[in-house]
Amino acid sequence: MYPTLLEPPRFQALRFFRDNFPGYQNAQPLSNVTLPSFTAMVVREIATAKAIPFDLALLGFLPSIAAADCGHSRVVLSDGSTNSLSLFIAVGADSGIGKSRALEDSLKIFSDWEHSAHEVITTENQNRNFANSLIDERIKVLGKKYAKTGEQTVLEEIYRLKNQKVAEHSIPHLLLSDATEAALSQHLIDHGIAIRLESDGVLLPKKAMRLMTKSWSGERISRHRMTAPSGVIEDPFVVDLVMTQPEFFRDFINTPDFLESGLMARTLPYYYQDMLCPREHPRPMDENTLGKLREKLLSLLNASNFCKQNPSGHRTIPVSKDAEELLRANCQNWTAQAKSASPLYRVREFVARMPQHALRLAGCLYLAEYPVNYEYPIPAPLMQTALHMTEVFLSHVLRWTIKDYGDVHVECCRAIMQFILEKNFSDVSETVLKQALRHRFKAADVSIAIYYLVSQNYLYEGLPEFTGTGKRGRPAGRTLFNPYYDQTGCSF
């Protein structure tokens, strides 16, 4: 990017309308958050080795920790209320910024663990099948004998042998790539968990949103289908991290279904905008740090109930008194702002869930920092970090979520100016703008936005274009002149 003093007016204007246009809250970066030691060490090494932004490395690390826990841990407050570590994170970032590299080491560790578990369970299933086949042969012999003699003792022996048969272990599938409602519900019924870690994935479809909101809250879910086996999910656990292109990210978090389903309040959105990505070439991670990351994820996986035939109860993570007081004070502050005329009123549904988000983030940091058998409560500094992270996500909710007509107006103004500046039009007709933005905004919204932009001298208005008396076709309307037109530039 050019230094500000040498930057052409067109690019200055484009940066202004992308980042600083009046009416938007400033979205804060996660790189400003002070992280605890182990998390900071691993995330910094991932960012450096993979030549990706620190923010994306952190956004890949935290869901990986939650995924490795597989729903085994619960954060418990002094009043007895519990919170699982289910996480929904939606990330928008431009192509080439390094989204796939943020997850590749964690995915490799999960894949290796799953492959090893497959081998162990496959061998065990072969032994079970052989034992069952021997029982079947014995039952066949006894069945012939019973048919001849009718002895009750033979029949009892047949029943006893049938009860000795053992079922096969289910083959574990930790990660899920299909985002359809049918795939998610079936995976939850089969395994009790559904985990997606997608570096360039598909955001949730409408039919899956209700299922995911209930899973995030840990509610009991029953499925009754004529075309598939029925099932009940008693204690669902879901981790859904999707990194995608900015256009898909913005469209998704502003769809009415996303807002009305309650998924918005349960999702942590993050849009990475800084185009100054690291210039270094990617390199392998430091073996010592990678070994510690692998040890951490594998210890969590092995301690979880996933793949266990006799699962234990949930691991409880208590919260220290100081940390709970810190959470309560922040919660009261957020609630007071949401009830007033502050910007938090616009996203009060998300504000109501912020204490839960903070507890889940604190739980993930706790699992990362301490051994799996650690029994001490979450300390206040760790809770402070989680609260800071929650407020960063809040800033992205405020920045990118369209909730009322004021948001529509601001977004429409930005869309008009970005379209004109990116195409580098010297002049453009009102009709062309309405056609270009017809899938996002009503024609009346575009007209109002143009009126505002002209009144603020962001655009200059020319005389209406006339097509001539008797000539067919829609009038072209006003001609708008771009004061930032770059004669030596090109469109992009």
List each model region and its residues.
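Phosphate-handling catalytic cores of nucleic-acid transaction enzymes
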Residues: M1-F492
